[in-house]
A protein has these predicted regions:
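Distinct, well-ordered alpha-helical segments
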Residues: 23-34, 56-64, 126-144, 160-178, ...
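N-terminal pre-domain/capping segments
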Residues: 1-101
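Hydrophobic faces of well-ordered beta-strands that scaffold small-molecule active sites
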Residues: 10-17, 45-47, 74-78, 114-116, ...
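A short, acidic, amphipathic alpha-helical segment used as a generic capping/interface helix at domain edges
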Residues: 205-215, 250-277
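Acidic (Asp/Glu)-rich catalytic clusters
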Residues: 3-7, 33-41, 54-75, 102-110, ...
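Active-site acidic/histidine proton-transfer and metal-coordination neighborhood
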Residues: 68-69, 85-184, 191
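Active-site beta-loop-alpha junctions enriched in small/polar residues
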Residues: 15-20, 48-52, 79-83, 119-121, ...
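Acidic/histidine-rich catalytic cores of soluble enzymes
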Residues: 142-240, 246
Length: 307
């Protein structure tokens, strides 16, 4: 557990620039996102580098300054193109180069968390998955001595069953590589498992598993993505908002015991982390409502009557 990564209270924030930001009085400059988050009493932003790290040093330094001014934490989401399990050496080489560019940006912008997807693996069998995981771990270990100290990669759980990133995969990566920590996207866990996070206890069981495999200190290292999701036979289908309802339940993997809302639910999640005395970073990726989803979770956390 890195003490610099531990907070006295949970940090609630957003992924990227929510649509509501561009409808606000702060919309004239993207750098105003930090003041906007402070205005909303939120604590964090995860900057998306989906299609590559393109931010220039000057902009990164400006963001760093504003984040400090408004006391907003920053994490980076690495490009989706990182595929360390590929059988093509050229693809692996480009993936490692993208990781190094993320580390450079993290140093400049004063972020110590880089979230990445373990990605695809060649083949379709369980054996192919195991081999892909071995290759990913091998390539991560190969850069151990070349990365800056105090900045960590966070391996994110996958939403699609055909990808690396099951909860078991993430634990195995974190066990093998000292500079990798777990990013639990609970909507992805819900989707990957075919829809299982319908209760506080089911989320608590996920936390128990991480604690059992990685130790109690690992609980404070977890970085969360939290929002509801629509699920189909392949896993995650679509991000949803907390206030969305299901119009045609026959299209969803639900049974009569569950209502017409999407899961996982914020109250189940907050109660589970409170039972574990966790104070993590929680990034909301709810559909077109990241900031309101983050506020919902923060309000539940500080509400005295939640049980």
């Amino acid at each position: 557990m890195d003490e610099k990564n531990v907070f006295d209270v949970p940090q609630f924030g957003v992924a990227g620039f929510p649509p509501a930001f561009f409808e606000s009085e702060f919309k004239k400059k993207r750098e105003n996102i930090f003041e906007w988050l402070d205005y909303l009493s939120l604590d964090w932003i995860e900057l998306q580098n989906t299609y590559g790290v393109k931010m220039q040093n000057e902009q990164a330094l400006k963001y760093c300054e504003l984040a400090r001014k408004f006391n907003i934490g920053i994490s980076l989401h690495a490009p989706y193109y990182i595929t360390l399990a590929s059988g093509d050496p050229a693809v692996v080489k480009r993936s490692i180069e993208r990781i190094f560019r993320c580390f450079h940006l993290a140093e400049t912008i004063n972020a110590n968390r880089i979230i990445f997807h373990p990605g695809h693996f060649p083949g379709t069998t369980d054996g192919d998955r195991r081999n892909g995981l071995k290759q990913l771990i091998k390539h991560l270990l190969s850069i151990k001595n070349d990365i800056p100290k105090g900045i960590y990669l966070y391996a994110e759980t996958a939403g699609k069953k055909a990808q690396l990133g099951s909860l078991k995969d993430i634990v195995q990566i974190c066990s093998a590589v000292s500079f990798v920590k777990p990013c639990l996207d609970l909507a992805h866990v819900h989707g990957f498992t075919g829809g299982t996070l319908y209760s506080e206890e089911s989320i608590y069981t996920v936390l128990d598993y991480v604690e059992e495999k990685l130790g109690v200190n690992a609980l404070q290292d977890i970085h969360f993505h939290m929002y509801p999701v629509e699920v189909d036979k392949n896993g995650e289908k679509k991000h949803r908002a907390f206030n969305e309802t299901i119009e045609n339940q026959q299209l969803c993997l639900m049974d009569e015991a569950h209502s017409n809302i999407y899961y996982p639910r914020p109250e189940h999640f907050i109660n589970a982390i409170k039972r574990k005395s966790m104070t993590p970073v929680i990034v909301c990726e709810a559909l077109n409502s990241q900031e309101s989803g983050a506020r919902i979770m923060k309000d539940i956390y500080y509400r005295k009557d939640n049980i």
